[in-house]
Amino acid sequence: MPAIIAHPGMPLWIDLATTDITAARNFYGQLLDWEFEELDGENSGYVVARREGMPVAGLAQVPEGSLSMWGLCLYTPDVVSSHDAAVSAGATSALEPRSLGERGAMAMLLDPAGAAIGLKCPADEHALLAAGEPSTPVWYELLVGDKWEETLEFYHELAGWDIRQASNDPEFRYAVGELEGGGLAGMWDTSAMEQSTSLWTTYMGVADIDKAVSQIPALGGVVVRPPYEAEFGRVATIQDSTGAILNLCEVAEYDPAQDDVHEPDLFAPEG
């Protein structure tokens, strides 16, 4: 599995806040073939999920009665300055910048629409991520329940994204955040829906979506929406065994013999 070099503003890391970390490990270990590493010291209780040795996601326990959910962090080389700039651009600080020891530094914000978004700077010299392959994130989508224009402008200011309006139909407004012409995330105006909400969602790659979805009930999860054809492939929506919502997207296995470039790879250095 190739490592991708992240550039400022790119999605860098996903975390699962879960009410049952043991159940979550069993669910994703079987579904995505993840291995798990338990950290100690100041990060005791935090679990890193890996695929073929590459870090893919983090898992953290939250109290019973909390909502299990996936969260997204964007890469920044300076968490403090990015946090302060985000607040000036209309965000609300949910977690002040702090050191995570060997995990680097991070902060959490609520964007103008109310969706949680993290900022992260790894402790390593280079920001590397696993993405675009089975068992790794392949796409991110923001549901915007309020303040559509303000939210688009916010991510342009915070992450440096060029915002491309893919559809400006009043009944379906959709935009894509891009860097150097490569799409990083979608943004969907959900304000007209009866139960509109604002949150970031993740699409996880799987090699065979029908096989993956068929496993969900036996693993204690729920198939929220069975596989269907979308613009970028076959996708499905599931709920894991602790209640967290996740999208699945069918993608090809990495083949180094092929000249296959996934969207995040567009920012890797040439040579």
Sequence positions of predicted segments:
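A short, local hydrophobic-aromatic micro-motif
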Residues: 12, 57, 70, 95, ...
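Short, well-ordered, mixed-charge alpha-helical segments that flank or form enzyme active sites
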Residues: 102-104, 116, 126-128
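Intrinsically disordered, low-complexity, positively biased terminal segments
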Residues: 148, 162, 166-195, 203-204, ...
